[in-house]
Amino acid sequence: MNSELLEYYLQHGPMTEIKANRHMVADIPPHIPTIVKYVQNILLHQHWSGAYGVELSDERKKEPLIRGVEGKLSFLRERGFGHVSEEKTHGEKMIGICRDFSVVGAGLCREAGIPARARCGFATYFEAGKYVDHWVFEYWDDGQQRWIMVDAQLDELQQKALKIKFDPLAVGEGDFITGPKAWLMCRAGNADPNLFGIFQWWGYDYLNWNLLLDANSLLKVPMQPWDDWGGYKSLPTAEWTEGDFATIDELARLTLAVDADFEAFSSFVQGNERIEVPAEFIAND
């Protein structure tokens, strides 16, 4: 692995940079199980809250709108948290979604000196036979010389409810399909696009959204699924030309090969305003 690329993923991006709240992440150990525990200490998944006995008000459902780790820590500090290692009741945690667990996980890894990045794609372990919208994070394992996927959302309760048979600290490639891989699988006719999505949204539009989210996340700009910055994020695939499909096919190929040719990938994304997240969207709120 290119040492410059690992250094890139070791450094914070705008969504994980921590400024005024550094005391809340002081002395994070370079130990993935502990980092995941810290993530679970501070976040409660919006769509699992009932399983933990927490009923959400409309106001609490707005908490995932805070994108950046700094903003999340500020929110938690106001709720009485002093450090991410503190264990509190589920009701005292901040409400988030899978993206938040993954972005915070990547941020804490970087604080611990571990290269990491959030990934958007689809999980096969939520609904049998379907590829459901999801996020994980990857960290670089020096000993194994490879990226290892982690699902920081899957605590003991969720593992039991979902009958998870794999280690959430080492998610397999068949368990989580990244956005670019999913797109190319469907374009090659190796998977049914209508099996990819969540809730009432399925098909190529959702595949495109998660590819765009993953590509920008690999440039350390992990957006929320509902963020709409125009370009291909807003244009339904039913309205695409052959040229549009060719562009996104190429994006998928370059994103899948990000480690082999980061320069080609980053140049392609940053050179296409219909793909790249605009600067005004990028803020650690």
Language-model segments: what does each one mean?
Residues N2-M15, V36-H45, Y52-E59, F122-W135, ...:
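His-Asp-centered catalytic microenvironments across diverse enzyme cores
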Residues N21-M24, G105, V136-D141:
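Functionally constrained cores in energy, signaling, and assembly domains
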Residues N2-E92:
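Secondary-structure boundary elements
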Residues K61-W135:
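Active-site neighborhood of thiol-dependent amide/isopeptide-bond enzymes
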